Amino acid sequence: MRFSQLIAVLKNGDAGVLSTSEGRDPELRGAASLERATADQLSFLEKGNALVGSLESSEAGAVLIPDQQELRELAERLQLAWAVCGDPRLAFAEALEQLHPKPSPQAGIHASAVIADRVQLGAGVSIGARVCIGDDTRIGPRTVIHPGVVIYGNVDIGEGCELHANAVLHPGSRIGDRCVVHSNAVVGSEGFGFVPTAKGWRKMPQTGLVVLEDGVEVGCGSTIDRPSVGETRIGSGTKIDNLVQIGHGVVTGRGCALASQVGIAGGAQLGHGVILAGQVGVANRAVIGDRAIASSKSGIHGEVAAGEVVSGYPAIPNRLWLRCSAAFSKLPEMAKQLRELKKQVSSEATGGSIEADQ
């Protein structure tokens, strides 16, 4: 694809192409970082990026840059094809879709797939090898189901979804449109519900639903449990990384982002646009407000206000946590000073002095 052809596509996208170079139109066969890009590859640079210096040594054939005069002048001096974008990272994402288009599996059903009698398949559905689908399941148009996927009975899947190899959907799973479930993810498994009795733990039947609203993406090896009653609901546009555990009855708002190894206990509620970094733990029935952010390994109990940034265990406001972290390394010296002060106070209380004792 020529650079000019790519820019013509990007101008219709969301990244905002503001201006482009003239007279240079390389053939692009891929994309790479500034350090690794070659003459037939595209790269990009963000505003304030620490890699600004690497642009000068880059061998990229074309580059997407922020609206900074010095970068335009540098790209011109290096004789690079360039485009100024309102959001270079977003433009790069849109460019990757053009340079590396996803293959479209052919519609149809593989001969080795096992499909129950009471299954409704929409137009253009693609079902791969050794897929198993139970009764009372509906699959919307243009959904792609890769090899080894298991879909229990009583599952509803919208249109344009993609289920990757070996994903599992349990009964009561309700999947919206354009959702992606990656390999080995499990949606709708039984929640961790047991009642203590004199004879031991009594299992609580988990009869509820799991609802993934439109545009949800679930990473590899992640699990979303169904509750005993009611539903576990993941808001539209939410992105879930690999190895995330979401307990029974959890509700998230729209557009949340949950990084790897996040664990959310049953009944917790997340507002819209919440971001949980890696290994964040959320306690049972905790409430997190809209647009709140928790940094890596935070432990959340109780309530986090809308827009708040928290860190640490137990989670506290991020700025306070930074001050505490800075003080932590000074604790040994502070303890030593405290011991010396205690000696001094004790000596003065008995009428002596440290100098005299020495």
Curated annotation (Swiss-Prot):
Q: Which UniProt keywords apply?
A: Acyltransferase, Lipid A biosynthesis, Lipid biosynthesis, Lipid metabolism, Repeat, Transferase
* Keyword Lipid biosynthesis applies: yes
Molecular function GO terms recorded = N-acyltransferase activity; structural constituent of carboxysome shell
InterPro entries recorded: Hexapep, Hexapep_transf_CS, LpxD, Trimer_LpxA-like_sf, UDP_GlcNAc_AcTrfase_non-rep
Q: Which Gene3D superfamilies match?
A: Hexapeptide repeat proteins (2.160.10.10), MurE/MurF, N-terminal domain (3.40.1390.10)
Tell me the pathway.
Answer: Bacterial outer membrane biogenesis; LPS lipid A biosynthesis
The alphabetized list of GO BP terms reads: lipid A biosynthetic process
Q: Which Pfam families match?
A: Hexapep (PF00132), LpxD (PF04613)
GO terms under cellular component:
carboxysome; membrane
Q: What is its EC number?
A: 2.3.1.191
Identify the CDD domains for this entry: LbH_LpxD
Q: What does this protein do?
A: Catalyzes the N-acylation of UDP-3-O-acylglucosamine using 3-hydroxyacyl-ACP as the acyl donor. Is involved in the biosynthesis of lipid A, a phosphorylated glycolipid that anchors the lipopolysaccharide to the outer membrane of the cell.
Subunit structure, as described in the record: Homotrimer.
Name of the molecule in the record: UDP-3-O-acylglucosamine N-acyltransferase
Q: Which organism is it from?
A: Synechococcus sp. (strain WH7803)
Q: What is the lineage of its organism?
A: Bacteria, Bacillati, Cyanobacteriota, Cyanophyceae, Synechococcales
What gene name is listed for this protein?
Answer: lpxD
